[in-house]
Swiss-Prot record:
Membrane-topology annotation of the record: Single-pass membrane protein
InterPro entries, per the entry: FAD/NAD-bd_sf (IPR036188), Flavin_mOase (IPR000960), Flavin_mOase-like (IPR020946), Flavin_mOase_2 (IPR002254), FMO-like (IPR050346)
Sample GO molecular function, one term: N,N-dimethylaniline monooxygenase activity
Organism: Homo sapiens
Expression by tissue: Expressed in lung (at protein level). Expressed predominantly in lung, and at a much lesser extent in kidney. Also expressed in fetal lung, but not in liver, kidney and brain.
Lineage: Eukaryota, Metazoa, Chordata, Craniata, Vertebrata
KW Membrane (keyword) present: yes
Binding site for FAD: G9, A10, G11, V12, S13, E32, V40, W41, N61, T62
Cellular component aspect of the GO annotation: endoplasmic reticulum membrane; membrane
Annotated protein name in UniProt: Flavin-containing monooxygenase 2
Presence of the UniProt keyword rRNA-binding in the record: no
Location(s) in or outside the cell: Microsome membrane; Endoplasmic reticulum membrane
Positions bearing the Glycyl lysine isopeptide (Lys-Gly) (interchain with G-Cter in SUMO) cross-link: K492
Documented EC number(s): 1.14.13.-
Length: 535
């Protein structure tokens, strides 16, 4: 008999967990508290309690080729960076293709997940749910928690003396939907992550003035990288990841600083991070520097105090007549349906083996999917997590001892603090390519480069120097997909397809730039031999 698995949430992590369960012959049931799939990526005009919320203009920060699921490329005519509605369309196509909706119970809230009395031998869980006011319970062999970590708004009001005196409007960025109603106002955005920057840029087009307060500064990157390709298809390669791992930390930090300042000098714009040697996640925004140049946005330091109508900053400057304050100060998370002893959240941190498994359980039948912030796309990350977890549930992969897992958790946390710092917003941060490879190794899906160099050198070179996308993890091992190799070699075609909307005459393959390179090489050779002749 197939093992029954409860999947909590039908967002990105929940959908891919359903598919992985089906792929492994498990019997999943997904509980989704709302009426539809999509999680945080499904825009709604009104904020709902217990549900993630986005603003209407949200666009992905990771490109389609680096974000799609490993055996299901996005349509080639989809733009490279997707509006939330377009991404939701992809999820709907995905769910329909793999017939996932039949496993989902919508408008069903999970009230509790408790160990069964014989858990030490069975590993089973009693799950209590509520739908239309009626409670039900069922026993499952395993549970996948896919409820996300962008639900509880973090508003540190006590950190802002005088907040109680402020007479203007204030709210968390979670409540922001669109710029209507903010025309002509003087607005202060506190926090300069991706959401804070997006909101500041959008409001600055019609507001009287927008100020953005950043405590430590930040790097700002464009979505557009070398030769106009998406940033992550250039940044996330195995070769670059190797360099970041083997070079001295100072050299890596210097390289990152040079790369970030290539677009614009952050020091001149008042944005340079206070501690440049901490690997803080950069802000992805194509408009911030231009809005700063136009004066529509002004960067400010930390807010020291608020009065009835003004903000006083740590550097002594004061901005008067503030109408609105928006707190883009991130989120905290919790699991109210779980006992604290199962997944304990302290200071926005959880102690999970590889960000997935509680280490102390007698049976490894509870897993958290998507409770992580990789320096890359969450979608392939959650997929590899789910692929590994379902194989653990099935007994095809095993976990080490509790002691070994706890040592790994401690070591990983120390490394995270060393790389990313101790900020509450960085508690789930991890390197991207390294983590994907780590999970793939557990599954048996990591490509063997030494073997490929002899069997398929063209593919080996592409895997090492090209974009590290999800298709690579379908080349070998469990879940192997025969279309993976072709998907890797045709990704450039899918990147360029939505851009080629104007017909151009075919240009000669023997381009002027190529000719200049040949002439330059010949000039170097001639100069070398001339030097030998005269020496």
């Amino acid at each position: 008999m197939a093992k029954k698995v409860a999947v909590i949430g039908a967002g990105v992590s929940g959908l891919i967990s359903l598919k992985c369960c089906v792929d492994e012959g498990l019997e999943p049931t997904c509980f989704e508290r709302t009426e539809d799939i999509g999680g945080v990526w499904r825009f709604k005009e009104n904020v709902e309690d217990g549900r993630a919320s986005i603003y209407q203009s949200v666009v992905t920060n990771t490109s389609k080729e680096m974000s799609c699921f490993s055996d299901f490329p996005m349509p080639e005519d989809f733009p490279n960076f997707l509006h939330n509605s377009k991404l939701l369309e992809y999820f709907r196509i995905f769910a329909k293709k793999f017939d996932l909706l039949k496993y989902i119970q919508f408008q069903t809230t999970v009230l509790s997940v408790r160990k069964c009395p014989d858990f030490s031998s069975s590993g089973q869980w009693k799950v209590v749910t509520q739908s239309n006011g009626k409670e039900q319970s069922a026993v499952f062999d395993a549970v996948m928690v896919c409820s996300g970590h962008h639900i509880l708004p973090h508003i540190p009001l006590k950190s802002f003396p005088g907040m109680e005196r402020f007479k203007g409007q204030y709210f968390h960025s979670r409540q922001y939907k669109h710029p209507d109603g903010f025309e002509g106002k003087r607005i202060l955005v506190i926090g300069m992550g991706n959401s804070g920057s997006d909101i500041a840029v959008e409001l600055s087009k019609n507001a009287a003035q927008v100020f953005i307060s950043t405590r430590h500064g930040t790097w700002v990157m464009s979505r557009i990288s070398e030769d106009g390709y998406p940033w992550d298809s250039v940044f996330h390669t195995r070769f670059r990841s190797m360099l970041r791992n083997v070079l001295p930390r100072t050299a890596v930090k210097w390289m990152i600083e040079q790369q970030m300042n290539r677009w614009f000098n952050h020091e001149n714009y008042g944005l340079e991070p206070q501690n440049k040697y901490i690997m803080k996640e950069p802000v992805l925004n194509d408009d911030v520097p231009s809005r700063l140049l136009c004066g529509a946005i002004k960067v400010k330091s930390t807010v020291k105090e608020l009065t009835e109508t003004s903000a006083i900053f740590e550097d002594g400057t004061v901005e008067e007549n503030i109408d609105v304050i928006i707190f883009a100060t991130g989120y905290s998370f919790s699991f109210p349906f779980l006992e604290d002893s199962l997944v304990k959240v302290e200071n926005n941190m959880v102690s999970l083996y590889k960000y997935i498994f509680p280490a102390h359980l007698d049976k490894s039948t509870l897993a958290c999917i998507g409770l992580i912030q990789p320096l890359g796309s969450i979608f392939p990350t959650a997929e590899l997590q789910a692929r590994w977890v379902t194989r653990v549930f099935k007994g095809l992969c095993s976990l080490p001892s509790e002691r070994t897992m706890m040592m790994d958790i401690i070591k990983r946390n120390e490394k995270r603090i060393d790389l990313f710092g101790e900020s509450q917003s960085q508690t789930l941060q991890t390197n991207y390519v390294d983590y994907l490879d780590e999970l793939a190794l557990e599954i048996g899906a990591k490509p063997d480069f030494c073997s490929l160099l002899f069997k398929d050198p063209k593919l080996a070179v592409r895997l090492y120097f090209g974009p590290c996308n999800s298709y690579q993890y379908r080349l070998v091992g469990p879940g192997q997909w025969e279309g993976a190799r072709n998907a890797i070699f045709t990704q450039k075609q899918r990147i360029l397809k939505p851009l080629k909307t104007r017909a151009l005459k075919d240009s000669s393959n023997f381009s002027v730039s190529f000719l200049l390179k040949i002439l330059g090489l010949l000039a170097v050779v001639v100069a070398f031999f001339c030097q030998l002749q005269w020496s």
